[in-house]
Design a protein with these regions (language model features):
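Loop-to-helix entry region of an early transmembrane alpha helix in multi-pass inner-membrane enzymes
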Residues: 45, 102-106, 113-133, 166-172, ...
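Transmembrane-helix signature of polytopic, membrane-embedded enzymes
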Residues: 135-160
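Membrane-interface helix-loop-helix junctions at transmembrane boundaries of multi-pass membrane enzymes
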Residues: 34-35, 140-147, 194, 231-245, ...
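Extracytosolic helix-loop segments that constitute the early lumenal/periplasmic catalytic or substrate-binding loops
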Residues: 54-56, 71-106, 110
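Transmembrane-helix motifs of polytopic, lipid-linked glycan transferases
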Residues: 122-144, 182, 339-340
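Membrane-interface transmembrane helices that cradle and orient dolichyl/undecaprenyl
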Residues: 183-198, 208, 234-236
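Membrane-interface alpha helices of multi-pass inner-membrane proteins
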Residues: 198-215, 219-224, 250-253
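Transmembrane-lumen/periplasm boundary regions of multi-pass, lipid-linked membrane glycan transferases
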Residues: 75-78, 233-234, 242-329
């Protein structure tokens, strides 16, 4: 199959050969030549650069997994044991439940066994690099170099706006975001007629979905939309259902653990998630008005992602946005999708408009379901990451639709004028000075876009400095290392009851999880005496009063100390 063009063609006359669900002829302008291979390399390398240098700087500054990263490392370690988790991380978007599945743990299980200190970080880096390349290649399959550079630019722009994603990609929201971008590109490819990308869409959407609950609705909707379009394409004369079978097998493998857990547990996690999606057990939620305002913040004239992230005031900024703007933009995107069928006859635009519309509606569902009881919206500031692809795709769709519509109007007006003035003269073959200039401008535009993306990647790396310093300055890192070393010297590997005292309350949980993980490779299993924190790791880590050593860690300004109470000592005090 020949490579797709860079641009959409003008409408074709009746009787000409047309292809695909939308009956749109492929363009013949600026096909992808071999000399554009360097652009492909730039697209990949620019997307990779922040993910490589950010974690490398973390490791150089003495990073250790604490908090959620420690929990992810510990649960990934358990995947190669008889007690592997079958659900994801504990989520704040519902009470007492977990993210849908353990795919992130499956992917990081081998790295954390190979390197117990940094494996969770560099393992996540490798996974995110693969996700970035999948996004670039999927977009490249649609529009050649233009598509690949757009995908790379989307990734780089996201890294500029939110540097944390590339610095700590092991954190499950950031891990899921990388694969959500890949799912967007794969969905665009499938809806554009490249059905072979549907299995990739199923896998990447499943990883994003299971990594964090905020991706669940958009990811599932993308997979279903692409399946429907692909099936219609197949029925309309493109035989072969191998892509459906492959995708379904991949989906069954990805969702085997959550489904098994659902039917073998008394309270299955998937059932609890469905139950809580209607607000049951979560109390008051943000609601539809807030979700429309959030979407307005993403697509407005001065979008929220246009400025540097200010998570401390993010929800105040959203609450002042007009809800009607989101409705207007959704209507424009829907109009663009319809006009892409006729009169524009541009399938890539129609596909992108459908993808944009689906993730926008999915984001509305997500942002309307954020619980506001027993939590602060400020603690969930990372959820705004979903606004970036929503806003950028909406802008891209509306802008492209406006340009192609203007081009169509001008071309039709010029055709009528030329027909009136030169009636009876031979038709122009379209290869006049204007057509030659257009062909010559294509490579220059590609080089300019590649240079701009490369500069953006360098800027993204330059903006990582403050975040690297903030992350590595966490006092829980040094304290957890000191405490775990003292415990390992005092006791052989065994189950222990762990408690942390005299430490900063805001970092107490992060240190506790950091110590629990640091001890695990040495044969310890820390049963945490803070039940709520322990349940985030699983029931095996909840202290139930057994006859095991109790380890009390005290963190004071002059140093860290431990006190061990053995079972015999406990019995003598009774």
């Amino acid at each position: 199959m020949s490579a797709p063009p860079w641009s959409c063609p003008l409408p074709v006359e009746e009787g000409l050969t047309e292809e695909g669900l939308l009956k749109i002829r492929r363009g013949t302008v600026l096909r992808r030549p071999g000399r554009l291979t360097p652009l492909r390399a730039v697209a990949h390398l620019a997307a990779w650069l922040p993910f490589i240098l950010g974690p490398a700087r973390l490791i150089q500054h003495g990073w250790r997994p604490v908090g959620d990263e420690a929990a992810i490392a510990l649960r990934s370690w358990s995947e190669l044991t008889a007690h592997g988790p079958m659900v994801g991380q504990a989520t704040r978007l519902a009470h007492g439940v977990f993210d849908p599945g353990p795919l992130e743990y499956w992917l990081l299980a081998i790295p954390v066994h190979l390197d117990t200190v940094h494996g969770v970080l560099w393992g996540a880096v490798i996974c995110c690099l693969v996700a970035c390349s999948l996004a670039v290649e999927a977009a490249w399959s649609v529009l050649g170099a233009a598509g690949g550079l757009c995908a790379s630019g989307l990734i780089v722009g996201l890294m500029v706006w939110m540097p944390d994603i590339a610095i700590t990609p092991s954190w499950n929201p950031w891990f899921g975001m990388a694969f959500f971008i890949a799912a967007l590109a794969a969905a665009w490819a499938v809806v554009s007629g490249h059905r072979g990308w549907w299995p990739v869409l199923v896998i990447t959407a499943s990883i994003a979905d299971q990594a964090h609950l905020m991706f669940t609705v958009p990811s599932a909707a993308l997979a279903i939309l692409a399946l429907i379009v692909g099936l219609v394409d197949t029925i309309r004369g493109r035989p072969g259902y191998w892509w459906v079978v492959t995708g379904l097998i991949a989906g069954a493998a990805c969702w085997s653990a959550p489904v098994i857990e659902q039917f073998t547990s008394r309270d299955g996690n998937l059932g609890l998630l469905l139950h809580s999606s209607g607000g049951a057990g979560t109390g008051r939620q943000t609601g539809g008005a807030f979700s429309l305002k959030a979407l307005s913040a993403a697509v407005g004239p001065v979008p929220i992602w246009w400025k540097s992230q200010q998570s401390s005031a993010i929800y105040q900024l959203i609450s002042h946005r007009p809800a009607g703007l989101a409705v207007a933009v959704l209507i424009l995107v829907a109009v663009a999708a319809v006009m892409a069928v006729r009169p524009l006859r541009c399938r890539p635009l129609g596909a992108l408009a459908l993808v944009s519309l689906v993730i926008s509606l999915g984001a509305l569902v997500t942002y309307s379901s954020i619980p506001v009881h027993n939590t602060s919206l400020l603690t969930l500031g990372y959820l705004i990451v979903l606004l970036f692809p929503v806003g950028v795709l909406s802008w891209l769709v509306v802008g492209t639709w406006a340009v192609l519509t203007a081009r169509l109007i001008v071309s039709r007006a010029a055709a009528r004028s030329a027909a009136a003035q030169r009636r009876g003269l031979p038709a122009d073959d379209g290869e006049g000075p204007a057509g030659q200039a257009l062909r010559g401008a294509g490579p220059l535009a590609g080089l300019g876009a590649a240079a701009l993306i490369a500069v953006g990647a360098i800027l993204a790396v330059a903006l990582q400095g403050p975040t690297v310093h903030r992350v590595t300055a966490d006092p829980a890192m040094a304290a957890s290392v000191a405490a775990s070393r003292q415990i390992a010297r005092a006791l052989p590997g065994q189950p222990i009851a762990l408690s942390i005292h005299d430490f900063d309350a805001s970092a107490l949980g992060r240190m506790t999880l950091g110590v629990a993980w640091a001890l695990t490779p040495d044969g310890f299993r820390a049963e945490i005496m803070r039940a709520r924190l322990a349940r985030e790791l699983g029931t095996r880590y909840v202290f139930r009063g057994g006859a095991i050593p109790r380890v009390k860690v005290r963190v004071r300004p002059h140093g860290t100390s431990i006190a061990v109470t053995r079972p015999t000592q406990l019995a003598s005090h009774r």
